[in-house]
Structure formats: structure tokens, C-alpha cells
């Protein structure tokens, strides 16, 4: 076996920590008080999917004794965290805690004028939002409640009631509806109302990210991002390129909750991936079946996500991050009460040593060494990216990535460079195995098919998104063709003006060679166009056979790949290694129908509609030792633009335990595809083979209208549309 082979992690004392590789970040950010982000004693418990995460949140908030600090991307007051048909929504629960005298702070991302709500319903029905009922499954009663909740917490709901009663019979009805919400009416008049403070937070511009630079290969790019292949644009809204989206639409994407920070013996924290919006509530069954919003899943889109609850010294870091954001001068506090700032000073007497890990506070939690890492705007911190780029060079067996996006090409480039080094140093094992679960739907993949294609190209897997791959290659050839035609005109003019026959002959030779290059490129473009038309015709025929509406192409249909497509990256002329060091399964997840069967499509308005679980997770596990759970997606936005926060651990119990739990869901408890000891290369190799069998079996089942055996489905996206905003 190779000298690079990693051994299984061991423990030191009671804390789970490895003794060979160091998976933590040594050069993490340094804080104002001289300390820095570092691995510290903690407890950790993963919370898989919304039911588990939100019920835990509800119970902890309900039992809070001192304070509740929430930092979140999306907040909907009418959302029910605990869906037993009797528990209050989060808006009422937080009001109740404020009435009890507990301090409640809510920090939610928003852009000036709430302009993000044109497309993102992240504020519920807050007064001033642009889309009133964006989330499918949200009831009109919830929409009304949201608006009244925001009026209540700023002390103006009683005025709304009075005005409604005097504005005619139609508005009298509204007044009566408001008065049914006794908690809102009580709260808006209570002197304890100021115990609940709500702020919106924006992200500071990072102008240094957009300074032009010259790369070592001589190319000029208009940014300083790690991904040097980002498509440059004109920086306009209509251009649709990354530079406008990343410059103008930065988001505060962190998701944390702190309970009772002022009492270290009681304090717990949450590092979340879930947002506090209805469509993030789902259970691990991922059924298409829906019900009332206080009794179960009410959003029609199944959603996969992972959060966590922690104790110990990591709470100090989570609090530091929260206070730093809460006390910013450019936050917008809701209402007219005096602005609540200075929480940093009020808590400065607490140090990490006050917060010892306490397993008794959280059942089934693990004692670990853990480190909080983040992406941040002021100061400019990019530690989550550093962790990924560092640790991918330490993996020796496998990587598991469950992420909303799979498009950070520098991660693959970093590993490919590392692979050459370890091969030269005598590694005898084959490529590592990258198991990936992500999204292929329009909603899930978002506006980033260009960088997703770049990721697939580096992995030699462009066949799973062939339309985009061909379209991008066509664009590249178009640029080449334009340059050749300009050169042709230059050569022609030089030739006819050449003073000697020798010079003229040389220029004519160059002209002829350039002419042949033009013909080659034009032929290649025509060939790409022909193959894309054939693919579209084949897809249309399949949809007709399946009684699908041809006017609504199935963007995620997993077609049987032709031999040509299986070698698409090479066919398109890209130079890739036959042994890049990584073998990748790139998968999406199928939901279940009302009968508990995995389905590729479902009926919506009488038509077959593609069925895909929306993967919102941001989890990566390496070699059954390293784990990161965070708010950060695998893209440039999360690594270098938005604010993000995550927790990293090097602990076999946590890594293997979480990996096995997630794979139990995705493989339908197939032990052969979800074995113990994946740190062992031979075991990972066999598991990779078994995943391949499951994927092929599900593909055959789809083709023959059979029943899939598990949720795993090979990523496939036929649509050729290229998006460059992320």
C-alpha cells in the first residue's frame, strides 16, 4: 500500500480528533481581541432535514431563559417549526418569549428597497416586499399574519385595527381577523414589545474583488476571484454575467441561532443550513404529498438539508460573528424604537473558557474538536474557501459532497495539481472517489450552468449536461472564428501591398492556412449544431412516447447516454487527462409519491412534471474523518462574496455517522452501497462500483417505466441554455 495511505482517526482523551492529518485551518482569521478562529472543545449533533431541525429549534426557543439570537437569510413569521397541529408559529413563539421578558434579536438579510423579493420570498409578507405570495403552499391566512406580525412588533397594529374599523364594512372584516390573533394584539400594546428587535442586514461592497489583473499565462481578467475562468461580461443586468450579479446582489447568507448565551451552563447554538421559510420544512421521506402548514409539509417541492446543534467553546465564535453583524451601523432596524446596538460590549466579559462542551444539554451529541470558519465582508474573510482548497489535497479515499450547487472549479484544479504530486511520490492506489448529490432542475441549478459545465469538464463528465457543453464550445469556436476572419482581412491587405514576391508568397501561404482554419472551425460549429438538433429531436420523441407536453421540455430527464456523449469532453476537443485522479458519481435525488414509491415524474395540472428533490444541503465529508456543515454552497459567491458560516470537525464518529445516515436515505438502506470504514480505499472503491449499479438500475427502471430502488439518479440536464451569473 502507498505511503500516502491515511489511517483511521483515533481519539485523544474524550475528544474525538485525528492524530495524523490536521484537517483544521491553522491560518484562520484573527479577531480584534488577539485571539483567532481555532479548533476548540465542543459537542455536535447533526439535524437531518426540516422536521428534525425545526422541532429542535422550536423546543430550544420555547425553553429559552435569557435570550434568542437569530441570524438568517430568510424569515417567515407565519412558519410553523413544530407541526403537530397545536404548536404556535414562530412569530407567536418569539412574541411569547419577549412577553416573558426574554431578549429576542432577529437579523435577516435584505437589499435596499427589499428588491430581492422580486424573485426571493425571504421576508415572508413583510410590508414593502414585492412578491406577496411567492412560496407555493403558503396560505392566504399566513400571508395576512406575516403583515400583521410586522405591524405588531413595531407597535402599530392597534392603529391598523382602529383604521380598519373606521374604513367601511370591508375593512371591519380585517379588524375582526386581526383580533383573532390575541398574541399580536397583546404584544403591540405591551411595554415588553421592545424585547423583540428585528433588523435587516446588507453586505458591504468588495470593490477590490473587481480590480483587473494579469494572470501568469498573460490573460487579463477583470476580477481577483480564485476562479480565473469566470466568464467576463460588461457588468450590466442584461449581460447576465457574474460581474453584475456578484457586485450588486451580495447576500448575508449565514444561518445561526444562539440560545441563552449569557448563561454558559445553559447555552446552546445552531449552525444551520435551513432557512426559516415554509418550503424548507420537510422530513426525510421526501414525499410529494402535502398537508396544512401546521400539520406537516405544505410546500410541493421536497427538500434535502442538514443543520446542527452545538455546545462548547464554538459558541463564543458564533456569538462573535453575530455581534459583529448586529452592531453594524448600516443595518436597518424595523420600527421607530431606539436602535439596539452595543451587544458586543455587553458580552465582552465572556471568553471561550466560559463555554465548556456539555453533552447533557443535547441527547446523542458527540464530544469533538471543532472550528468555526466563515466568509465575511467587513473584515474580508474567505476561510471556508481556504478549508476546501486545503483539505481536498489531504483526501486519499473518497469525498462526499451534498450541495445545492456543484460549481467551484478551483477545487478540482487544486486536486488535479495535487494528484500529479502524490503520483510522483509513489501513490499506488487509483483515483479517489467523489460521490456528489446536487440539483439539475431549473430551480435547483439556478443561474450558473456555465461554471457547472467548467466543473464537469475538469472531471471529464460533460456528457451529463451535453446541451450546455456544446453551446459553450460553440461560443468558444465563434470567438476563434471571429479572430480568424479579422486575421484573414489583415493578411490579404498585407499580401497585396507586399513589395517583394518572396514576402507575398509567404503571406499567401499564411492566408491559405488561415483559410483552412476558418473552414475547420465552421465545420466544427456545423457539426455541433447538427448533434444538438439530433439530441433535441430524440428528446422530443421520448416525451411524445411518454405522453408529455412537447411545449414543456423536461430539463432533467435522464436519457440513456449514447457512446458519443459518454466521451463528450474529448469529442469537443478539450485536453483532459485519462487519469485526472478523480472518479465522480454526480447524482440528483428522486422523491416519493403518495404511495411511498420513488418517482421520476408526477402529475401537475394533468401533465407529467419532472420530479426532483431540491438539495439545499452544504455538507462535505472526506475519508470518514473530516466534516464541514455550513451555509456555503460550492460556488464563487459563497466562497468569496456572500457572508457564510460553517463548522468543521475531524472526527471519525461524526463523519462516518453522518455519511452513513445520509446514504441510508439516498440508497434506501443498501448496506453494500453504504459500508463502514470508507477511509479504506478498497472499501470506497467497491462502494463507488455499487453506486454505479444502483444508478444504472434506476436508469433502466425509468426507461421501462419501472419502479426505482432508491433515490439516486444520475445527474442529467438536456437544456442547452447557458447562464453566467454565478
Predicted regions and their residues:
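Charged, low-complexity intrinsically disordered terminal segments
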Residues: 2-726
Amino acid at each position: 500500500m502507498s505511503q500516502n495511505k491515511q489511517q483511521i482517526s483515533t481519539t485523544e482523551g474524550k475528544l474525538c480528533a485525528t492524530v495524523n492529518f490536521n484537517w483544521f485551518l491553522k491560518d484562520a482569521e484573527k479577531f480584534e481581541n488577539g485571539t483567532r478562529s481555532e479548533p476548540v472543545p465542543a459537542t455536535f449533533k447533526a439535524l437531518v432535514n426540516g422536521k428534525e431541525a425545526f422541532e429542535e429549534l422550536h423546543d430550544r426557543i420555547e425553553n429559552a431563559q435569557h435570550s434568542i439570537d437569530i441570524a438568517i437569510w430568510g424569515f417567515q413569521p407565519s412558519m410553523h417549526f413544530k407541526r403537530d397541529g397545536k404548536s404556535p408559529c414562530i412569530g407567536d413563539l418569539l412574541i411569547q418569549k419577549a412577553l416573558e421578558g426574554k431578549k429576542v434579536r432577529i437579523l435577516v438579510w435584505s437589499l435596499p428597497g427589499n428588491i430581492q423579493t422580486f424573485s426571493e420570498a425571504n421576508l415572508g409578507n413583510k410590508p414593502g416586499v414585492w412578491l406577496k405570495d411567492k412560496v407555493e403552499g403558503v396560505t392566504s391566512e399566513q400571508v395576512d399574519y406575516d403583515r400583521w406580525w410586522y405591524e405588531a412588533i413595531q407597535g402599530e397594529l392597534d392603529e391598523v385595527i382602529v383604521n380598519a374599523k373606521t374604513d367601511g364594512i370591508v375593512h371591519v372584516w380585517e379588524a375582526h381577523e386581526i383580533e383573532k390573533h390575541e398574541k399580536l394584539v397583546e404584544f403591540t400594546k405591551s411595554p415588553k414589545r421592545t424585547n423583540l428587535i428585528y433588523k435587516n442586514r446588507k453586505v458591504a461592497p468588495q470593490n477590490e474583488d473587481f480590480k483587473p489583473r494579469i494572470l501568469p499565462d498573460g490573460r487579463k481578467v477583470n476580477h481577483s476571484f480564485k476562479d480565473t475562468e469566470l466568464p467576463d461580461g460588461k457588468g450590466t443586468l442584461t449581460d447576465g454575467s457574474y460581474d453584475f450579479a456578484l457586485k450588486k446582489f451580495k447576500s448575508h447568507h449565514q444561518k445561526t441561532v444562539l440560545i441563552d448565551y449569557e448563561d454558559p451552563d445553559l447555552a446552546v447554538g445552531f449552525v444551520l443550513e435551513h432557512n426559516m421559510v415554509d418550503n424548507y420544512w420537510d422530513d426525510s421521506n421526501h414525499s410529494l404529498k402535502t398537508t396544512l402548514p401546521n400539520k406537516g409539509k405544505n410546500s410541493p417541492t421536497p427538500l434535502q438539508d442538514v443543520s446542527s446543534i452545538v455546545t462548547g467553546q464554538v459558541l463564543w465564535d458564533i456569538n462573535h460573528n453575530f455581534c459583529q453583524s448586529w452592531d453594524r451601523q448600516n443595518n436597518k432596524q424595523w420600527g421607530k424604537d431606539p436602535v439596539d446596538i452595543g451587544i458586543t460590549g455587553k458580552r465582552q466579559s465572556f471568553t471561550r473558557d466560559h463555554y465548556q462542551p456539555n453533552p447533557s444539554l443535547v441527547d446523542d451529541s458527540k464530544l469533538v474538536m471543532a472550528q468555526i470558519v466563515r466568509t465575511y465582508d467587513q473584515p474580508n474573510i474567505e476561510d471556508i474557501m481556504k478549508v476546501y482548497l486545503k483539505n481536498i489535497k489531504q483526501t486519499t479515499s473518497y469525498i462526499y459532497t451534498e450541495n445545492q450547487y456543484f460549481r467551484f472549479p478551483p477545487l478540482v484544479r487544486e486536486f488535479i495539481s495535487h494528484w500529479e504530486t502524490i503520483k510522483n511520490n509513489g501513490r499506488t492506489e487509483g483515483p479517489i472517489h467523489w460521490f456528489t448529490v446536487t440539483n439539475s432542475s431549473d430551480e435547483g441549478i439556478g443561474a450558473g450552468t456555465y461554471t457547472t459545465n467548467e466543473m464537469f469538464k475538469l472531471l471529464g463528465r460533460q456528457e451529463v449536461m451535453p446541451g450546455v457543453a456544446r453551446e459553450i464550445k460553440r461560443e468558444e469556436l465563434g470567438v476563434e472564428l471571429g479572430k480568424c476572419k479579422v486575421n484573414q482581412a489583415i493578411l490579404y491587405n498585407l499580401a497585396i501591398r507586399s513589395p517583394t514576391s518572396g514576402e507575398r508568397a509567404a503571406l499567401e501561404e499564411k492566408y491559405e492556412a488561415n483559410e483552412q482554419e476558418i473552414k475547420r472551425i465552421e465545420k466544427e460549429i456545423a457539426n455541433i449544431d447538427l448533434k444538438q438538433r439530433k439530441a433535441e429531436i430524440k428528446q422530443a420523441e421520448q416525451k411524445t412516447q411518454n405522453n408529455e407536453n412537447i411545449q414543456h421540455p423536461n430539463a432533467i430527464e435522464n436519457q440513456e447516454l449514447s457512446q458519443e456523449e459518454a466521451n463528450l469532453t474529448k469529442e469537443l476537443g478539450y485536453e483532459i487527462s485519462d487519469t485526472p485522479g478523480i472518479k465522480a458519481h454526480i447524482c440528483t435525488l428522486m422523491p416519493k409519491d403518495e404511495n411511498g414509491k420513488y418517482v421520476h415524474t408526477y402529475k401537475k395540472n394533468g401533465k407529467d412534471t419532472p420530479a426532483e428533490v431540491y438539495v439545499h444541503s452544504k455538507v462535505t465529508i472526506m475519508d470518514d474523518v473530516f466534516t464541514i456543515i455550513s451555509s456555503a454552497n460550492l460556488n464563487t459567491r459563497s466562497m468569496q462574496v456572500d457572508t457564510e458560516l460553517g463548522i468543521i470537525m475531524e472526527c471519525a464518529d461524526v463523519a462516518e455517522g453522518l455519511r452513513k445516515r445520509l446514504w441510508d436515505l439516498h440508497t434506501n438502506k443498501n448496506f453494500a452501497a453504504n459500508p463502514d470504514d470508507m477511509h479504506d480505499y478498497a472499501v470506497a472503491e467497491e462502494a463507488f462500483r455499487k453506486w454505479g449499479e444502483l444508478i444504472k438500475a434506476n436508469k433502466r427502471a425509468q426507461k421501462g417505466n419501472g419502479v426505482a430502488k432508491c433515490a439516486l439518479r444520475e445527474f442529467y440536464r438536456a437544456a442547452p441554455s447557458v447562464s453566467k451569473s454565478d
